[in-house]
Amino acid sequence: MVVKAVTVATADEGFFRALQQSAQRHGVDLRVLGCGEKWGGFGWKLRKLAEFLEACDPDDLVLCIDAYDVVFLRPLDDLETWYRRHVADGGAPVVSSIEDRGGIGDVTAGVLFGRCRGTLLNAGTYMGTPPALLALLQDMCRAGACDSRDADDQRLLTSACVRRPDLVDID
C-alpha cells in the first residue's frame, strides 16, 4: 500500500503555496490535478479525482485534500497503519474529516451543508482506497448531481455519508 495525496488546483492562490511547501517539508508526494485549467465546478473536480483514482493501484491509500486551505503538519508515515487498523476494526473504507467551527459558524455551516450523524463533515480532507473512493464519488454524483454548476462537494459528501454509513466514516 502506497500513500498518495492528491488535490485539484487551477491557480496559485489561497494557501496553495503553503500546501506545497508543507508537503515538501514533510516528504509528502502531492499530486496536483487541474493546474492551468479553467475551474469547472465541483462536479468537474470530482471527475478529475475519479480519473486519477482509476489510474491508481487498488491497494493504494489516497488522501484527497483541498488545495487552498489545507497544510500538512507532519509526514504521512503512520497514516497507512492507522487506516489498516480502522478498517480491520470494522470501520468504513472512506474516512472524512470534520468541520469544527463552533458557535454561530457551526449553526450556519449546518444549515448550508447539512450534517451526517450529527456532525459537520469537511470535504477538504477525506481518504480511502481507490475502489472505495470511486464508489463514494459515484454515490456523490448519482442522479446527475455533479453535472450542475451549483454542485458543492461538501453537500454531496454529507449526503453520501447519510446514505452510506457502510462506506463513509467520520474521524
Name each region found by the language model.
Residues 12-15, 38, 42, 116-126, ...:
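Aromatic-acidic/polar surface patches that form glycan- and anion
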Residues 13-16, 46, 69, 73-76, ...:
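Generic preference for well-ordered alpha-helical elements
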Residues 17-21, 35, 76-78, 138-141:
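Short coil/turn segments at secondary-structure boundaries
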Residues 30-39, 95-100, 149-154, 171:
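A generic structural motif
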Residues 38-65, 71-75, 118-121, 152-157:
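A conserved donor-nucleotide-binding helix/loop in the catalytic core
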Residues 70-118:
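Conserved donor-nucleotide/metal-binding helix-loop-beta segment in metal-dependent transferases, i.e.
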Residues 120-171:
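Catalytic core and acceptor-binding pocket of nucleotide-sugar-dependent glycosyltransferases
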